[in-house]
Amino acid sequence: MDIRAAEISAILKSQIANFGEEAAVSDVGQVLSVGDGIARIYGLDNVQAGEMLEFPKAGVKGMALNLERDNVGAVIFGQDQEIKEGDEVRRLGEIVDVPVGRGLLGRVVNPLGEPIDGKGPIQYTERRRVDVKAPGIIPRKSVHEPVQTGLKSIDTLIPVGRGQRELIIGDRQTGKTAVAIDTILNQKAVNAGKDESAKLYCVYVAIGQKRSTVAQIVKTLEEHGALEYTTVVVASASEPAPLQYLAPFAGCAMGEWFRDNGLHGLIIYDDLSKQAVAYRQMSLLLRRPPGREAYPGDVFYLHSRLLERAAKLNEDNGSGSLTALPIIETQANDVSAYIPTNVISITDGQIFLETDLFYQGIRPAVNVGISVSRVGSSAQIKAMKQVAGPIKGELAQYREMAAFAKFGSDLDASTQKMLARGERLTELLKQPQYAPLSVEEQVCVIYAGTRGYLDGIPTSSVRRFEAEFLARLHSQHADLLEGIRTKKALDKDLENTLKSALDSFSSTFA
């Protein structure tokens, strides 16, 4: 082997010339104190608010939140037991972001977008910051397309539109999550079709819930074939407060990808009360001044900047939409507490679920008297508007009369008729869990209720009437259901067909 001196000297010269070029510049700080998931750091002079930090020794990440004169207050996304005073902290030079796109559908992820379902890495081509500005006024359009929840009491009386924020509020164990899950399950039919503009992709954000509860929800979605168009973001009760705070923003970024690509997204925050509690915990540990109920002063802004990101965009911006269904848990039906009033004032309406109704067997336990949708009937198809108009008035009169009827025994015939009709309509609006109805089925059933076909049958037989009538429609009048689905209106021919179907069915019903 011959050694060429010229070659060796050339290599040495090039190495000396290029020496030190790849030396990475990193802004490094030191941990001053750590505890309760909060670290005080000295030395990160150029760090940005919301920037990701790394604690290399402990192998965990964090986020800078408090930028003070002589130190930085950071929250830790993980266990802080491994972090010691004097440990090195590095800036990562990026604001918290998550992967977005279709690759997340059918997956269960944590608030940093990392998979926790054991199905391998996530395929994505794009990442988005979790906390971005909401669309302005000019790119928006008024809400005019329906989100079909599959629940008669909501689709007829409190319609939700694409791009709307509709709050689901009630005490614990009143069926708030059940309403949200039914809404996801009901999208299976439209998502199975070819029309991308009709599809509704779902994001379910579980904040501060038990892992067993979340596992049950994921199992339900999987069994009903709904997980394939749904992303589940989980920050369970055992996760640190910063991750529970971050989860809704991460889910929102994933939902916004659909909105900004001309598609339709639906996001469920279950629930924002727990996010507010996590934010309160972080703020108090960071020594921010407390306000009402010890929440920080900007807890309203926390929820408003999140919910304002749900919007319906106009044609110039792709006509996409993101619909939000935030959930708030009340204590003893107290809607005048701080967080409930905040979120009620931000959203475009609310669905009140009541414990009393739930225990009376009225499920979903929607109080149709005080629930409201500020979008109203512009979020309904024409057929639903035609049949749902009378039911609102009749139920309102029934509630008023029922209160008076408690005191008087001798009621005139018209009052008795009104009470009987109201009872049957209330019974008609009941529905079992995980059994959403398509809009054409709802139109036919509500039509039967408001046109007096139920008046002659006992209240206890209303549910049986509905089930058997729908079975008859599917077996003998499939063209009627198809007509309502395609025309989205109840024209004279369809109405006559529906009337004759009801007449023949009610004459044989016993």
Curated annotation (Swiss-Prot):
Instruction: Write out the entry's keywords from A to Z.
Output: ATP synthesis, ATP-binding, Cell inner membrane, Cell membrane, CF(1), Hydrogen ion transport, Ion transport, Membrane, Nucleotide-binding, Translocase, Transport
Record-given protein name: ATP synthase subunit alpha
Checking NCBIfam families in the record gives: atpA (TIGR00962), PRK13343.1 (NF009884)
Under the subunit heading, UniProt states: F-type ATPases have 2 components, CF(1) - the catalytic core - and CF(0) - the membrane proton channel. CF(1) has five subunits: alpha(3), beta(3), gamma(1), delta(1), epsilon(1). CF(0) has three main subunits: a(1), b(2) and c(9-12). The alpha and beta chains form an alternating ring which encloses part of the gamma chain. CF(1) is attached to CF(0) by a central stalk formed by the gamma and epsilon chains, while a peripheral stalk is formed by the delta and b chains.
The UniProt record gives the binding positions of ATP as G170, D171, R172, Q173, T174, G175, K176, T177
* Entry's Gene Ontology molecular function annotations: ADP binding; ATP binding; proton-transporting ATP synthase activity, rotational mechanism
Q: Which Pfam families match?
A: ATP-synt_ab, ATP-synt_ab_C, ATP-synt_ab_N
Q: List the disulfide bonds.
A: none
Which PANTHER family does the annotation name? ATP SYNTHASE SUBUNIT ALPHA, MITOCHONDRIAL
Q: Which gene encodes it?
A: atpA
What's the superkingdom here?
Bacteria
Q: What residue range is the signal peptide? A: none
Specify where it is mainly localized: membrane
GO terms under cellular component: plasma membrane; proton-transporting ATP synthase complex
